[in-house]
Regions:
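Extracellular/periplasmic ligand-binding regions of membrane signal-transduction receptors
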Residues: 1-16, 135-142
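Bateman (tandem CBS) regulatory domains
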Residues: 5-8, 58-59, 161
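Residue-level detector of alpha-helix boundaries and kinks
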Residues: 9-12, 29-30, 62
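Short, flexible loop segments at the rims of nucleotide/cofactor-binding pockets, characterized by
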Residues: 16, 62-64, 142-146
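Sensory modules in modular signal-transduction proteins
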Residues: 17-41, 146-166
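Sensory/regulatory domains in signal-transduction proteins
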Residues: 43, 58-140
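Amphipathic coiled-coil signal-relay and dimerization helices
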Residues: 46-52, 57
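Generic macromolecular interface patches on structured domains
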Residues: 55, 87, 143-147
């Protein structure tokens, strides 16, 4: 039910999620081999989808609301409209105490927050490149969502202009 209204975010986030996941877990020698979870939420902080290399304590449908699970990067990034990183000891929710999460908002140029793009890792696997990667990925998804919104507006206008001219 939560996923139905988020097709635009899911469709545009999927290729970016796969790229980030492959970069972190794939067979080459860069930052590879990291145990991670790459995820996307909707504008209410509901986890829509994830890619993980092993079981992590999040699942689709989970709500990243501070009132429910305490301090978390998803809620913080959407509230502050800026990337947020929360380290293990900063999590109120005990299941997250061994993890670090970086999340950044998916925002279109009209100022609408559509969700968040994040990476969750074990604390020992974290370095600052993960924060940068989350931020760049959210901006890429934001750009794709923005293009899709403009495309649908343009198609709507063209459909109605044709009707008006005829």
């Amino acid at each position: 039910a939560c996923r139905s209204g988020n097709g635009l975010v899911l469709a545009n986030a999927a290729p970016i999620m796969h790229s980030v996941f492959e970069l972190l877990t794939g067979p080459k020698e860069d930052i590879k081999g990291v145990r991670c979870c790459v995820f996307v939420t909707d504008s209410s902080g509901v986890l829509l989808t994830k890619l993980d290399s092993q079981p992590f304590p999040i699942r689709p449908g989970m709500v990243f609301d501070e009132r429910l699970i305490g301090t978390n990067s998803v809620h913080s990034c959407m509230e502050n409209r800026y990337i947020s990183t929360v380290y293990g000891f900063e999590h109120y929710f005990e299941e997250f105490s061994g993890y670090v999460a970086s999340a950044a908002p998916i925002i279109t140029e009209d100022g609408v927050v559509h969700g968040a793009f994040g990476v969750l890792l074990h604390c020992g696997d974290y370095d600052l490149s993960i924060k940068a990667m989350s931020d760049v990925a959210s901006k890429a998804v934001s750009s794709l969502v923005n293009s899709s919104v403009h495309r649908s507006h343009r198609e709507f206008l063209l459909d109605h202009i044709d009707d008006a001219i005829i």
